[in-house]
Amino acid sequence: ATLLDNLGLTGLAINSTTNPGIISYWQKFNKNGFAESSNHRSYTFRKGIIVPKRLTVSHRDDARLEFDVVPIFDGTNNAIVVSDAASLPTIAINPARWTLGPITLGNEVLTEYTQLEIDFGNTVETGSSESDIDPTHVAVRTHEPTITITGIDPQWMSSSVFALGGTVVAQATDAIYLRKRSGVSFVADGTAEHIKLTPNGILSVGQAAQAEAQRIGQTTIMVKLGIDSSGNAALAVDTTSAIS
């Protein structure tokens, strides 16, 4: 939730004049244990962009957010500054976790879904000039998010749910929830700590049916997201939502 709040859907600029950038630490391991406190490696990215790539969550698993860091030359330092004399910081661990929650698409309540993937569709382009070795500018050129949902209910593809021709998905009627965990159970539905994603777009059949001998068949639907006629965003995210 914190990453989604900070990155948004199209990324966050890294600027060394207003923040220290991003540092990735690599702990050195000797044959008989870890190295001394100041002999580890670090990679520092002082300027660039950090961009969300995809969010995935499967039945009984925790949601995962993947992102890319695209560094550029900041005018003084290389795009990536390497040090082999780094001291490791104290790592802060956030125990918050989310998993699959209720899903409504095309004003239909889905059942028997097993996997959700949101590809944020961010295409990043870097460039430079004057024979610079490192890239000197970066931009998100396109943002074309898609949602893929896999389930084991063949009735998704029926006249009473989703026809093979697909249907419209709208923020006014549809939502995807990520349910927050609490120990071995879940946070109460009425507590505003869940994640709600509301999409606009067109739902289509990704794979009407896939099955093997003695295996449960699967069905896949895809939602191509886009801005609606009122100018609402392709996908809205609320990280402090109750489930309704």
Task: Name the predicted role of every residue range.
Residues 1-244:
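Signature of extracytoplasmic/envelope-associated structural regions
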